[in-house]
Structure formats: structure tokens, C-alpha cells
């Protein structure tokens, strides 16, 4: 994204990471080519390099990576951007392969409540009757959905929590 990483896996992991990231930065390692092991990726890079042997390094990665990721990988690889592919050494190529299999990002924070997809915090479920969703502290007050201190991984679980707790609360209103 414009400000960091996103997607289903990140959303699921963020539930756990959010608790830690408030205390310290986290290191995220991404395999940019998960379908290939290192040897297969090296073969792929060799094949791509053979086809692009007269191109500069920075212009040779378009079959391997999304356009916006290429400048980042070029910089992190420490291979000179204008170096011709036929001049790239085996060590440089192996460094590129290692980078693609172990792409590291430092996570420094969250984007905040206004951009949150899932939130944490709220009324403790210990203070709510789970059968009726009525407050154990204040009679006649009911809680449902994201007002509760409950969050789940992606896949519709948060929606199901909202629907189920709303149903339980509504069924017990007088």
C-alpha cells in the first residue's frame, strides 16, 4: 500500500502484532516468490537474465516483480542499477535471490483507528452474560458486535460475532 503492508494474511497477523508493535518495532519477512524454492528461483533469474543480458539491471526485473517493487529491490540488492545484466556476478545474483526469498520490512506502527478494518478493545466479555449479552454490572444494558473486546482473524468471523451477539441480545430484550 502507500503506507505499508496489507492483505488477508497481514490482517490476521495484525491482531497479534498490534499488541507488540505498541512496545517495539517488528521485523516482517516476506517470501516474494513462495512458489519457488531458492534453487528454482535462481534458475528463473538466470533464464530472465539470459533474455535481458544487454539490459541494465534496473530494467531487467519486469517479468519477475511488480513495477512499483522493482526500484526497492534494486536498491536493497546493492547491485548498481545501470549495471548490464551480463556483468552481474554469481554472488550478486545469489544476493538478489536471497533478497527475494527473505524480503525484510521493519514495522514501526499502525495507521490508526480511522483506517482500521478490525479494532481491539471494548467492553470486557468477562463483564457480559454470554447467553443474553446483558451487562453483569448494569442491569438492562446489552452489548453486541465490535463494542465488545473481541476480534477474530479474517474470513467473516468478526461479522459472525456481530450477528450472533446482536441476536442473543435482541432475543433477551423485554
Predicted regions and their residues:
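A conserved FAD-binding loop/helix module that cradles the flavin
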Residues: 149-174
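An anion/pyrophosphate-binding glycine-rich loop and adjacent beta-alpha core
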Residues: 1-87
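Gly/Ser/Thr-rich beta-alpha loop segments that engage phosphate groups in nucleotides
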Residues: 6-9, 123-124, 147, 154-158
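N-terminal low-complexity, intrinsically disordered patches enriched in charged
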Residues: 13-16, 130-131, 165
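Short, surface-exposed, polar/charged, turn-prone segments marking secondary-structure boundaries
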Residues: 27-29, 56-60, 127, 135-136, ...
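Predominant activation on well-ordered alpha-helical scaffold segments within soluble catalytic domains
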Residues: 10-11, 94-97, 101, 163-171
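A glycine-rich dinucleotide-binding beta-alpha-beta segment and adjacent secondary-structure elements
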Residues: 71-151
Amino acid at each position: 500500500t502507500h503506507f505499508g503492508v496489507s492483505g488477508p494474511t497481514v490482517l490476521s497477523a495484525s491482531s497479534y502484532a498490534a499488541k507488540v508493535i505498541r512496545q517495539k518495532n517488528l521485523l516482517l519477512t516476506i517470501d516474494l516468490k513462495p512458489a519457488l524454492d531458492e534453487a528454482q528461483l535462481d534458475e528463473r533469474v538466470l533464464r530472465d537474465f539470459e533474455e535481458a543480458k544487454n539490459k541494465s539491471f534496473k530494467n531487467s526485473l519486469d517479468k519477475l516483480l511488480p513495477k512499483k517493487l522493482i526500484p526497492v529491490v534494486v536498491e536493497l540488492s546493492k547491485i548498481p542499477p545501470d549495471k548490464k545484466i551480463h556483468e552481474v556476478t554469481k554472488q550478486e545474483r545469489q544476493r538478489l535471490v536471497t533478497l527475494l526469498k527473505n524480503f525484510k520490512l521493519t514495522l514501526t506502527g499502525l495507521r490508526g483507528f480511522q483506517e482500521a478494518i478490525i479494532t481491539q478493545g471494548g467492553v470486557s466479555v468477562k463483564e457480559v452474560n454470554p447467553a443474553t449479552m446483558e451487562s453483569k454490572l448494569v442491569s438492562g444494558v446489552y452489548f453486541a458486535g465490535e463494542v465488545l473486546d473481541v476480534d477474530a482473524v479474517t474470513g467473516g468471523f468478526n461479522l459472525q460475532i456481530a450477528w450472533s451477539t446482536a441476536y442473543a441480545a435482541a432475543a433477551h430484550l423485554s
